[in-house]
């Protein structure tokens, strides 16, 4: 509530639209009637402005100058004290025309477990918003495939591999009013091997729709997506899909969101019928029945009469909704304690506040395949997910030791944008950019913060899957794609006025590798081109060259991940490849504390090598990291040489002496040493440290570590015994299991080495009805027999190379 004193204080300058944004909508409307917004006045033609008397003209200049001063002041505070600057203050200073645009923008992603219906739902969204004229299904039964699956591979396999970006407009109709919203929409993969695509999408989005299956509820990849959303503070609404499936139970899914994801959730709808008899939903906020009519459900019919048999359920679930909101929102809590009934507006406002604050997710329900209840979910995106100005975005100022700064969603501010995805198109490299601050214009020069390289932006396009639409400029909060900008995924661009960089995305380490080479030497040039392009596009796809085996090694997140790239090379570059057996990314670690006193001494007449290092090695506190410490007293080794020692330690950790894999969980301490006046050098100390490391490591009873994978297997219930048997054969540790109406799920930790070929065995054991996902969990000591085999194999390979 706005008090009279506040309204008086907000008179004068505060009546301009630039200061009105903090007030509730009723007060905004009252104040806006009192004066013409600054931006509109500034846009009047000359003959109109000349008719304004001198006093109002002076007042207008004062208002305009005051607005510019306020923006400059906020920009200073955003850099000096980002935590002290609230989003409310930022929003209050947005120009009226800019607010009109940005308040109706929603940057949203659709994410979920594989086969939950993400792409099917997106296809309906595009159809109902008028972006496409016909609906095509995912698995290409009509030989077309879903619009958002633009790669041939995606259409064949029925999965989404890359994040497809599109935009569409949705007209929200309520109480006889129509409001047009602009969606930038990203459809993401559900398969765990393509998790980097989900990471990249969530990094640049302001909100998300989390889709769950009404039968399976929260699944393994749902938990991964939840973790990613929490990492990037992405608010979400939830949509329980497949309500027409046998065994559909949306309330089980809601319980799992509450219990498994630890996120307060409540239904904002209840179904009218279920399974084959699913007809529509009841809106619990307005207590209206909603049905879809028309050949593809394009017509929404609302009825005040709720079916009698649904009323008790609707009333019970509405009570639960209000109780849940009372736990996460102070205003509803106060109303609840006073035993008053909240109004529709109060409930909707509370859901919006709690959702944006990451305290709550409203749950919608429907069936994308049956064309039911998608439109109310789109209204939910408008009502409950934030616009770009309501989300805090931070950058790092390189000129101030990477101090955090808050970005302002103002078109007048210096441009800052993030390249979050790269694609190769027929017209060259396509770079997807999210504009966080300022305006990106066609023909403008932008600077890459990573290498300070200046590039010109020749074309700006909005993408619709693999089609495009050219635009002249893109404002703050929008997503676009540009041509002719050479960069890497995760690069920050500015207009040169600021030395800002965005914090980078989390990129998981690869867990599987294999050797690869083209079958024909004439394809080597295309092979190299493909490798370079795939690395630029996907940070989880790594390429290296093993000098000892003289092989090119590719590494990634799983077998499917690498298979897709091998297949893409064949299709897109006409390069057939030979691949070796998949190799597990083992690690090595120290077994116990070992002391060392190592002297490197080489003198041959001229300048020689001399370095003595003394200290010890021991297991570090965390298995995940290596640690180097110096405890030199009295300057026995100079700072310059100690830096070389640390470099030698890091190099030694890259390739362990036991089986040639990276070293983890090892700490090295140097506490004494000696130097020679002429023969000591940085190279001497680097080499001495590496030699001391190798010797001490092999004396420490070292261990091989193998990656354990968090594995989730789902199959029809009649195959439970066969699946458990398959896992036991692979020495899996079964952590948990769930039994549903017609299927069961097993959660286990499995050795990656034992899981090669598991997919074909699972298909055979379950008649093709089982599915599984694997995600890296942690490293654990390998069995003694496996370690012995790996060491023997490594020693034999070393001996064979020496013979050559």
Curated annotation (Swiss-Prot):
Q: Name one GO molecular function term.
A: translation elongation factor activity
UniProt protein name: Elongation factor G, mitochondrial
Entry's HAMAP family?
Answer: EF_G_EF_2_B
Which CDD domains does the record cross-reference, listed alphabetically? EF-G (cd01886), EFG_III (cd16262), EFG_mtEFG1_IV (cd01434), mtEFG1_II_like (cd04091)
InterPro entries from the xrefs? EFG_II (IPR041095), EFG_III (IPR009022), EFG_III/V (IPR035647), EFG_IV (IPR047872), EFG_V-like (IPR000640), EFTu-like_2 (IPR004161), G_TR_CS (IPR031157), P-loop_NTPase (IPR027417)
Residue ranges constituting the tr-type G domain according to the UniProt record: 103-389
Recorded hits in SMART domains, A to Z, give: EFG_C, EFG_IV
